[in-house]
């Protein structure tokens, strides 16, 4: 399985963006962050975590990987540069997967010798040798657009959460994900290039 991971924000409280710009923002605008992991082939959401807006992306990656059963092999994990951290690379390497994470612009090689650090240093060398654009094409980084599309589908079911309690907000998002996975299970259209 090729796992694609990203996160997005869902509004809980506060006015819309237009209202905030026109009339000034209210003092309280609350967001929840939803972290998704999808299977690239089936386009099914396999892992989900909901956090407050103050939690970063990188600390959640090991929890997302833990939601995939240990007996299921993960071939690769593709994420954005926010996950370029030792803990993320080590968690991916511990699952025996390849990490496709673009190194940060000011990245330096890591001195520690772990499987995750070695893989990250190889990716850093490749981006410096090939350039970022060619590395993205070579590594198949463009596949990450599938998770962006799936997050847009989550937002099509509602851009804000109705529940006030955090546990109920998590349940509300779990219902949305179950609905999306149900639609995905019905079938994915196959497109073919003409010409």
What is each model feature region?
Residues 1-105, 109-111, 116, 172-177, ...:
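Polybasic low-complexity intrinsically disordered regions
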Residues 5-7, 121, 169, 183:
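N-terminal cationic amphipathic segment used for targeting or macromolecule association
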Residues 37-41, 62-65, 124-130, 151-157:
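Short amphipathic alpha-helical segments, especially helix-boundary/capping motifs
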């Amino acid at each position: 399985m090729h796992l694609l991971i990203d996160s997005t924000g869902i509004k809980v409280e506060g006015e819309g963006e237009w209202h905030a710009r026109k009339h000034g923002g209210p003092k309280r605008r609350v967001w929840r962050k939803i972290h998704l992991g999808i299977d690239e082939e089936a386009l099914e959401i396999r892992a989900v975590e909901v956090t407050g807006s103050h939690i970063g992306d990188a600390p959640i990656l090991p929890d997302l990987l833990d939601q995939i059963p240990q007996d299921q092999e993960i071939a690769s994990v593709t994420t954005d540069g926010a996950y370029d951290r030792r803990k993320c690379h080590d968690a991916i390497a511990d699952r025996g997967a390849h990490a496709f994470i673009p190194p940060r612009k000011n990245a330096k090689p890591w001195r520690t010798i772990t499987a995750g650090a070695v893989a990250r240093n190889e990716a850093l060398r490749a981006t410096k040798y090939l350039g970022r654009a060619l590395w993205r094409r070579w590594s198949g980084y463009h596949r990450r657009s599938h998770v962006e599309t799936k997050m847009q589908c989550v937002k099509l079911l509602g851009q804000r959460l109705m529940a006030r309690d955090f546990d109920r907000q998590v349940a509300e998002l779990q219902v949305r994900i179950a609905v999306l996975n149900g639609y995905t299970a019905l079938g994915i259209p196959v497109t073919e290039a003409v010409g």
